[in-house]
């Protein structure tokens, strides 16, 4: 799990670079959130299958961290769709507000996951 936490740290550090696009920063923060959700899922003894893996990992948060994470899960699902559009259909869709909000969520999520695995 140490390597997964290292990926999270790298993604968060890279996303803090303001000279890259908001789309790229959003993608990096989403990847960090996805890794954190995966760490929590693995800690609880599960792994998501390959089919709809991102969806399954993200939607596992209320089960691994508690029902307080339901709204965060919905937000991350919206971000996943936006990230998909940014990667495959368009550019310039991410806003600074979304990036900032996702950054705060990732910070909170990392704290919760670190507490879980202790």
Locate predicted features.
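Terminal alpha-helical segments
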Residues: 1-118
């Amino acid at each position: 799990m140490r390597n997964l936490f290292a990926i999270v740290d790298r993604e968060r550090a890279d996303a803090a670079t303001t000279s890259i696009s908001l789309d790229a920063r959003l993608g990096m923060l989403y990847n960090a959130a996805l890794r954190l959700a995966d760490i929590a899922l693995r800690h609880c003894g599960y792994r998501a299958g390959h089919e709809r893996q991102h969806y399954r990992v993200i939607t596992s948060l209320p089960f691994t961290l508690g029902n307080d994470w339901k709204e965060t899960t919905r937000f991350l699902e919206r971000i996943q769709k936006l990230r998909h559009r940014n990667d495959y259909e368009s550019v310039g869709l991410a806003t600074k507000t979304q990036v900032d909000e996702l950054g705060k969520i990732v910070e909170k999520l990392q704290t919760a996951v670190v507490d879980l695995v202790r």
